[in-house]
């Protein structure tokens, strides 16, 4: 990981550093970020949380995206459901998430927190069900925070507090958009 960081030449990146889910194989097809072509161009996606896999989740995924699934994770299936909803929403990410949150409501999930990197923006999604959080996790485990300092905007979840005196909480049920060219930041309600 550190070797890759020292060689990377990019203005934007997303990283998902965590322990692997116990029952799933540790292999490239199960590794974040997931990257696909979409109506928005190339899109990269990482997810922190758990979504019950099964018929309810599969019903939200178009057949072509279902056929492209490579791994076994709920995260990849959630991403395919997002891509399906993006298609239905003509690439409007806010509208796609507003619909997706409604579609996910009857599905058992802890969190559909995500970071999404497109050709034009970085998007951070905060949507979780505190009542479904495992008791061994800290109460703020799925809470998300962000800050902008000297033109650099960063976002993080549990355990990371780069500057405890200068950060904003991203409200549960909201989405943060960062324009990659201008650095402009906007928030939107999604749930």
Could you tell me what each predicted segment is?
Residues 1-191:
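N-terminal segments that mediate ammonia production and transfer
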